Amino acid sequence: MDSIHGHYHIQLSNYSAGENLQSATPPEGVIGAHRVKVETALSHSNRQKKLSATIKHNQSSRSMLDRKLTSDGKVNQRSSFTFSMIMYRMIHFVLSTRVPAVRESVANYGGNINFKFAQTKGAFLHQIIKHSDTARGACEALCAHWIRSHAQGQSLFDQLYVGGRKGKFQIDTLYSIKQLQIDGCKADVDQDEVTLDWLKKNGISERMIERHCLLPTVDVTGTTGSEGPDQLLNAILDTNGIGYGYKKISLSGQMSGHTIAAYVNENSGVTFFDPNFGEFHFSDKEKFSKWFTNSFWENSMYHYPLGVGQSFSVFTFDSKEV
């Protein structure tokens, strides 16, 4: 969210010669017929510093994109300011305090951090907070793009950042992520259906298993809450006898929702992506299971029913195996 700074300064003029400014009562507005003018070297210096900081901030905001327009001539999405943006920023801050604990726990359970990413802070938050439909987060769209990139044998972060390193965004990918999230937040649509349609257009379809001459999807829904994450974990790791699969995992609670993703392979292990914490890899399902159950579920604060720890839906997708 772009900050709006209001600068106020009081000026005192038309003082007679020899008048002691230091002994005068600090004025507000106009005293008698005298215009107000209080000017000190210190206040002037402070204003210069603030102006310089503002200019640098605006310049850095613009330079965060590799170019001003997308390949098809579209500008980075933004909307009018709403007070909900302030609330979402505070929620992001609370979640961002959990980042160190989650990341530090990965190595303790034999995992590796592939990429440190967090939509709850830093430059990416600055981008999504610009629009009311992405200010609360872009987890659904991020996970869809992550699945597509991984299925293509690529990295989402190579596509999102210039050179694959944090610093400058590639506007085409940033725009695509934000737009998918915006499309899924429209009042007359189902976000899951919007995401499923987008994935299908990108060559990734829901897995279907033939049963009694029918081809139903293998989506799994369940509850967490006081039951813990065991049922959720089983749904994530189940590859339906095929040996691998992509997972889009929707978590819901009393007041919020969140989406995470995973690629599960019986031979190479589990690659896990949470837009709040980053991309992690565990060489086998057992290591991932212990980490998810004994550490991640609580460290992330996802176990709270008031947050997202009440129910779940797990969607499984097929694509070319990578």
Swiss-Prot record:
InterPro entries documented for this protein: Papain-like_cys_pep_sf, Peptidase_C58, Peptidase_C58_Yopt
Record-annotated active site: C139, H258, D274
Enzyme class per UniProt: hydrolase
Covalent S-S links between cysteines: none
EC numbers on record: 3.4.22.-
Keyword presence, Transmembrane helix: no
Any GO molecular function: cysteine-type endopeptidase activity
Record's keyword terms, sorted: Hydrolase, Plasmid, Protease, Secreted, Thiol protease, Virulence
Principal subcellular localization: secreted
GO cellular-component term (any): extracellular region
Residues covered by region (Disordered): 42-69
An example Gene Ontology biological process: proteolysis
Record-linked Gene3D superfamilies: 3.90.70.20
SUPFAM superfamilies noted in UniProt: Cysteine proteinases (SSF54001)
NCBIfam families membership: yopT_cys_prot
Chain's role: Cysteine protease, which is translocated into infected cells and plays a central role in pathogenesis by cleaving the C-terminus end of the human small GTPase RhoA/ARHA, a regulator of cytoskeleton. Once cleaved, ARHA loses its lipid modification, and is released from the cell membrane, leading to the subsequent disruption of actin cytoskeleton of the host cell.
Family: Belongs to the peptidase C58 family.
Subunit structure: Interacts with human ARHA.
Name assigned to this protein: Cysteine protease yopT1
Organism: Yersinia enterocolitica serotype O:8 / biotype 1B (strain NCTC 13174 / 8081)
